[in-house]
């Protein structure tokens, strides 16, 4: 099968392409049948020398069955030689089979967690009103005792911390005076 395609030339970072007619199995920059134009992507898009083609030869090769590559077809359509339409592949962005299965499993786990959380929230809410009255009374009685018990150790700890600090500060002051 014959292709109308680009063959790269030029130096590193300075591409220059020849538009050639070549067998589809030959290498990109390898043997070709005929050179039918040139393409210089470094020139501005409105520059007439950006793409130079032999229109009669391209028409002849298209008539013989040569297929242009996408890039060449796009450039030829700008010149009015061929019609180019953008390809549309709606399945390209779809996730694969494994990704779909993982998403379903994740959704199922989240639904199970939400259901369990709803059950857990509903069950204690029903039981809690019956138990709250005695619990509040017991908590009210225990609270003053607990508060007094917490305050005593806290006061002792504060006193212990203050005493060593005072002892360390006293000799330091004495040394400064001497």
UniProtKB/Swiss-Prot annotation:
**Organism this protein belongs to:** Phenylobacterium zucineum (strain HLK1)
Query: Among the record's GO biological process terms, what is one?
Result: translation
Bias kind Acidic residues: ranges: 128-139
Know the name of this protein?
Small ribosomal subunit protein bS16
Ranges annotated as biased composition (Basic and acidic residues): 91-113
> Organism's domain of life?
Bacteria
Q: State the family named in the UniProt similarity comment for this chain.
A: Belongs to the bacterial ribosomal protein bS16 family.
**PROSITE patterns, alphabetized:** RIBOSOMAL_S16
In this chain, composition skew of type Low complexity spans 114-127, 140-172
- Give the molecular function GO annotations: structural constituent of ribosome
Where do the segments described as Disordered lie?
78-178
Keywords (alphabetical) are: Ribonucleoprotein, Ribosomal protein
């Amino acid at each position: 099968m014959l292709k109308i395609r680009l063959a790269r030339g030029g130096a590193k970072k300075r591409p220059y392409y020849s538009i050639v007619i070549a067998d589809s199995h030959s290498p990109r920059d390898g043997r070709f049948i005929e050179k039918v134009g040139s393409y210089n992507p470094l020139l501005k898009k409105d520059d007439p020398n950006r793409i130079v083609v032999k229109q009669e030869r391209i028409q002849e090769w298209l008539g013989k069955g040569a297929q242009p590559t996408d890039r060449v077809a796009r450039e030829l359509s700008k010149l009015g030689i061929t019609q180019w339409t953008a390809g549309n592949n709606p399945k390209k962005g779809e996730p694969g089979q494994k990704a779909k299965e993982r998403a379903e499993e994740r959704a199922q786990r989240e639904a199970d967690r939400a259901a369990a959380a709803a059950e857990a929230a509903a069950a204690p809410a029903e039981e809690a009103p019956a138990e709250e009255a005695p619990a509040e009374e017991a908590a009210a009685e225990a609270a003053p005792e607990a508060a007094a018990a917490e305050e005593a150790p806290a006061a002792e700890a504060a006193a212990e911390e203050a005493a060593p600090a005072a002892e360390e500060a006293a000799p330091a002051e004495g040394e400064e005076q001497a």
